[in-house]
């Protein structure tokens, strides 16, 4: 399979300097396996940049994403989206501030499987399709048809329940919902897990197009090749900490592999 790469969609040499990025400072998140699943993590993602996180699963990546998304409490530290502190903001407020989130488990976190495709496409944003407290079904249907066409969701029937679609098309619903609106920062956690080659290439192209449009993107993937192909910078996360951060153009599997199991990295 030929992966879409950061160069193949016209990446610039340096990220854009305008727009809204993400700044995480000294973030600590508690957990079950360790006292600190995320341990004093700090980073910045500028507009027009993809920061990829590599690492063996279970080293705090999921907890980091969930904390930024508002799904897990923060013990200490801060999260800023542009000039706005969203550390204690609700999920809806983060969403309205321009934070999008592709969760790692589409069926558990991303979709309501019994809901229709149309209802899943506006999940969490129903208040934008409401008039006097009543959902505007015509507006939802029109929006759903546009998103189905734009993101090539098959079959193109907004009234089907999400469970009736293939895994790849279920993932496209999530991607369409989170990337088909105005957003500043995207959290993409295992965005191509369990989907076919065609869907992988489509999702990669959408992520890179968003980066080129000036969005800041945090990518987490268990597929090291995916992280290497899409990222502008790569951080390795081990036992809740970033143990190395480097430009993706300088990174190799041979360099990153040892860091993923806690060994020192030669740079």
Indicate where each model-derived feature is located.
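Glycine-rich phosphate-binding loops of nucleotide-dependent enzymes
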Residues: 1-267
């Amino acid at each position: 399979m030929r992966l879409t790469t950061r160069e193949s969609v016209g990446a610039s040499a340096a990220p854009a300097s305008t727009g809204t990025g993400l700044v995480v400072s000294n973030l600590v998140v508690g957990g079950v396996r360790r006292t600190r699943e995320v341990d004093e993590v700090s980073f910045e993602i500028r507009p027009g940049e993809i920061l990829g996180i590599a690492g063996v699963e279970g080293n705090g990546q999921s907890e980091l994403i969930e904390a930024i998304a508002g799904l897990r409490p923060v013990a200490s530290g801060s999260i800023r989206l542009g000039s706005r502190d969203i550390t204690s903001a609700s999920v809806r407020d983060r969403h309205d501030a321009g934070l999008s989130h592709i969760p790692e488990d589409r069926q558990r976190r991303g979709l309501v499987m019994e809901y229709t495709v149309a209802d899943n496409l506006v999940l969490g944003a129903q208040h934008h399709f409401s008039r006097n407290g009543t959902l505007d079904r015509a507006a939802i249907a029109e929006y759903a048809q546009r998103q189905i066409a734009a993101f090539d969701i098959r079959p193109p029937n907004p009234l089907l329940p999400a469970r009736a679609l293939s895994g790849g098309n279920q993932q496209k619903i999530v991607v369409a919902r989170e990337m088909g609106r105005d957003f500043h920062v995207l959290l993409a956690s295992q965005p191509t897990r369990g989907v076919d080659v065609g869907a992988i290439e489509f999702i990669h192209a959408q992520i890179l197009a968003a980066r080129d449009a000036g969005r800041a993107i945090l990518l987490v993937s268990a597929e090291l090749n995916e992280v290497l192909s899409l990222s502008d910078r790569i951080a390795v996360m081990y036992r809740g900490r970033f143990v190395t951060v480097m430009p993706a153009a300088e990174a190799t599997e041979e360099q990153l592999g040892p860091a993923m199991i806690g060994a020192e990295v030669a740079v």
